[in-house]
Amino acid sequence: MVTHGDKIMYRISKVLNHNTVIGIHADDNQEYLVMGKGIGFGKKVSERFEVRDGDTVYSLQATSNRGNAKELATSIQPIYLEIANEILDEAEKVFQNIDRAVLFPMADHLEYAV
């Protein structure tokens, strides 16, 4: 599941960097990767926050041949997650509709290639 700015409350599970956190959704108690400018800045574990317009939310429930999404999200350096997200943002501008489920494999590939 990927949503943009759904205005639902989350609770911080882990701060990956200033722009990336793992949050627990208030309604379904599932973990999501939330990316947005400064979203993790000054945040502490268990602090509540709201997704803003422009933030991107990725489900951490999916699994692939490289592992589950949460393991990938915490093992990949956050800068590569941000770069992959920016690439997907630009691709979305050109192609309108893209599959954002490629974020984790793309970030993993970028980290390995560099």
Task: Locate the predicted segments by residue.
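A cross-family "folded-core" feature that marks the main globular domain of proteins
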Residues: 2-114
